[in-house]
């Protein structure tokens, strides 16, 4: 099955969609053979080591990514693919795909990647108001024209209908997750410790993601400051790109609380260092205000690391029910309870949670199932066309 992914960027710092597409492209052995067309600059460093074909049509001059080359490119190349996957909303990708494929027999899917969560309507009402004209003129029709609109959980699918009053499309919930690590955990841990030597030989909790207000980073720093004295040997690693230049303010908060030496900021970590960070952590923590899935959650579980999540992570409830982690509200009190519950667990309870995390990952979040599902959708679409 030959599949084309259309997306704004493959930059790992852009978050989950970039990582998920990279993982999907690794499943050629089961028939998922793909290429990617992006708005990236051809000289972008993150494109240099990819093992699959990429067609960078950038650079572009805005986050929307209007590019007059994209529609003709898709029209000229669509015959090489059994189907096309549009990743994300609110960029030119979706409109270009719909225009290029109009009147053809090439099906396309739209992967929303959480971008229809009503959180954004409430957190950024002005931005939401500005999106209405584009929704009415373009984005809604991009979804209406798709063979299927993909969601990663039933909760995400239901929440999507609360963002805009026009929501007639054909939804489909796909299994989603991550690809687990391959290699020696001890070697990977040492690679991480080389990048963050302050926690070598120490106990730590791990936050791994963008340093962004949506992720609840301030809640985590404030909660850790309040409970630091309850477990004086416990450290916190805040790993991820700081796109909002916010970490300095958070570090100042830690300094005023007298715990700056126990919170560490290694920046974005990737590859073996990332897996080493997961393997070395007591638990992964994500007090996010909105998370349609959270690839880092699945990656932590793949390493047998328990996860401490807010109830706004759409998969948090099923993980808590599996005994692989804890779930609390996305508030300061909720984040405090996550830390309190973790500190109160016994070594045996932590071992059991780690075992459940690994088992739950294998049962629920193996990304190979995502690849098989997308293949099946395109097989069905082409059979009926």
What are these regions (language model features)?
Residues 321, 325-333, 341-347:
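Conserved acidic donor-binding segment of nucleotide-sugar-dependent glycosyltransferases
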Residues 116, 131-149:
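Membrane-proximal helix-turn-helix segments that form the acceptor-binding/catalytic region
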């Amino acid at each position: 099955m030959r599949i084309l992914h259309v997306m704004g960027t493959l930059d790992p710092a852009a978050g989950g969609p970039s990582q998920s597409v990279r993982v999907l492209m690794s499943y050629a052995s089961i028939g998922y053979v793909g290429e990617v067309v992006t708005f990236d600059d051809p000289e972008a460093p993150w494109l240099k080591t990819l093992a699959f074909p990429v067609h960078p049509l950038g650079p572009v001059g805005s986050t929307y990514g209007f590019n007059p080359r994209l529609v003709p490119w898709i029209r000229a190349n669509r015959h090489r693919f059994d189907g096309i996957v549009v990743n994300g909303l609110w960029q030119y990708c979706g409109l270009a795909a719909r225009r290029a494929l109009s009147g053809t027999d090439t099906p396309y899917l739209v992967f929303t990647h959480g971008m229809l969560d009503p959180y954004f309507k409430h957190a950024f009402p002005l931005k939401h108001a500005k999106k209405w004209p584009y929704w009415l003129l373009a984005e809604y029709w991009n979804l209406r024209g798709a063979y299927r609109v993909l969601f990663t959980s039933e909760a995400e699918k239901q929440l999507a209908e609360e963002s805009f009053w026009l929501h007639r499309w054909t939804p489909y919930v796909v299994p989603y997750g991550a690809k687990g690590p391959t290699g020696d955990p001890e070697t990977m841990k040492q690679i991480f410790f080389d990048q963050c030597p302050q926690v070598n030989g120490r106990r730590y909790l791990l936050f791994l993601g963008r340093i962004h207000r949506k992720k609840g980073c301030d809640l985590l720093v404030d909660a850790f400051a309040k409970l630091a004295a309850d477990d004086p040997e416990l450290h916190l690693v805040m790993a991820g790109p700081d796109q909002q230049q916010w970490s300095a303010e958070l570090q100042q908060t830690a300094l005023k609380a007298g715990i700056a030496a126990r919170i560490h900021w290694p920046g974005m970590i990737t590859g073996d260092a990332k897996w080493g960070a997961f393997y070395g952590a007591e638990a992964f923590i994500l007090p996010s205000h909105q998370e349609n899935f959270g690839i880092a959650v699945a990656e932590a579980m793949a390493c047998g690391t328990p996860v401490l999540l807010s109830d706004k992570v759409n998969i948090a409830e099923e993980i808590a029910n599996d005994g692989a982690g804890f779930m609390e509200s996305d508030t300061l009190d909720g984040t405090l309870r996550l830390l309190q519950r973790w500190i109160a667990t016994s070594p045996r309870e932590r071992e059991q949670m780690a075992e459940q995390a690994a088992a739950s990952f294998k049962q629920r979040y193996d990304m190979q199932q995502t690849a098989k599902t997308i293949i099946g959708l395109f097989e069905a679409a082409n059979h009926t066309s």
